[in-house]
Structure formats: structure tokens, C-alpha cells
Amino acid sequence: CPIGAHSDHQLGKVTGFAVDQGIRMAYRAKKSGIVEIRSLNFATRAQWHINAVPDKCQNDWADYLRGATWALAKRYPLTKGVCGIIEGSLPIGGLSSSASVIITFLSALCKVNNIHMSEHEMIMTALDAENNYVGVSCGKLDQSCEVYSKKNHLLYLDTKDDSFELIPQHPDMKPYKIAIFFSGVERNLAGSKFNMRVDEAKSAAYALMAYAGMDYGKFEEARLRDVPREIFEQYKDRLPENWRKRATHFYTEFERVEKGAEAWRRGDIEAYGRLSFESGHSSIYNWET
């Protein structure tokens, strides 16, 4: 996500690219309904039945796969499990690795159970697994990038109405390379302060709605996308510092995404790059990732 980070859970607009790394899985169907899975990236194996997924996370790497099973079983009858080996070339906790492993495993379960899901349904099932089983309050950016992205195109997605566009690289765009650096720091969003920051953004939306006399409903439904920026500018000084920072990131990032999509469309890679660096700066200092 070059521009649009940390705004999908607030129903913002985002951009995304495909990368040439990912998750690979070799598998076969198991008529018994048992899932037996081994990862070449971790020492332990995991096993469960497709219709008896543990109610709670086991706090290991396979929780994402259990979540995928749980989310799919809510939508379709499952009769077959899988026996497989999974391997990834993505850094753990980075580059959408959790979304990638969920979608890879969902695809395998769908294949052996003869289930045909639309792209949007695949995204929402993967999001359900991560939100409601693993317990990460993420939005749909990562899942959408995994499903929709196309080589030499920029994904431009509105996470509020799910409309998206794949903007092709302009024929006159200057040559460029995108470098991704692995810091060596691995993380697990479920065990980080990620959820707290999402709640701070929701709290800012909830408070701004109240200050402005808007109908603010339930906390879970409060999103900054539903609060006009003019309201934020009017009442931002009343917000606690952390809430104000999260909201500042959202509103400035929303503007950067729109400008970035237009810069990409006209082939201005330098402008797009500047906006991407500004996005990273805001992620560090306003979102405090």
C-alpha cells in the first residue's frame, strides 16, 4: 500500500500494488474433514476438523487458517478437509502476509469443496476471519490488494462502497523501481497496539459527531469517513492528542490518495513518489505505527 495506509478501517480510499512474493501451498483433499497443515516457516504442525474449529485462537501461526475455515463454514457446507504444506516468502507480520495466507488457504478449501466464490465474497470472507476470529480490527485493504491487483496497474479502491479501478501504468511514465526494505522486526497485529489505534480513530469520529450534533449511533459504527473534514477542522482542538493524530492521518491520507491516483493516471511518478513518502511520514508521526 504505497498511499492509503491505516485508513481502510475508517472506510477511506486506498491504493495498492501487487508484489512478486507471496504464499505457496501444496495440498490434497481429505474426505475425513480433517485439516492437517504444516508450515515450512514454523516448527509446529496444526490439525482440526472443518466443522469443529476451536472457539478461541490457539495463539500460533495456524490461527489465520482456523479463522479461514471458521469463516467459510459459516457461509458454505464443508465436507472435505485438506492435508498440505504451506510456505511464504513474505516477512512475518509485513506486506499483508496474514491476508495472503488466509486467502491462499481459503482458495484451497474452496477448491476441494467445489465452492465458487466471487472476488468480493473472497475478500469479505477473509476479512471476517481476521476481524472476528483472529481479532484484528483491520480493514479490507490487504485482502483487496491480494485479490484485485494486476501487474503494472495501480489499484484504486474506495473501501466504503467497494468500488475500485485498476489504473494502468501511463506509457510515458519515467522508469522507476519500488524498493521494499525489511527492518528485521517481525510483529503480530493481534498482539500489538493496532486495535487500540483503530479504536482511537473511531473514538475521534464518535466525539466529532457528538460535538457537531450529528447522529452518532453506536461506537462500532462510527467511522471518520462519515465525518466531513470541515467538522474535524472545527472541533479538532477538543480531541485528546492521540485521537487528533489518528484523525489528522485519516483526513490528510484521504487527500493524498486522491492526488496520488491522479498523479499515477497522468504518469507523474515523481509526484506519486512524493505523496508516498508523505504517507509514510504521517503513518509514523500521526498514526504512530
Where would I find each of the regions flagged by the language model?
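C-terminal nucleotide
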Residues: 24-60, 71, 153-289
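Short N-terminal signal/transit or membrane-insertion segments
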Residues: 99, 103-118, 245-261
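ATP-binding N-lobe of GHMP and related small-molecule kinases
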Residues: 1-96, 103-120, 124-134, 138, ...
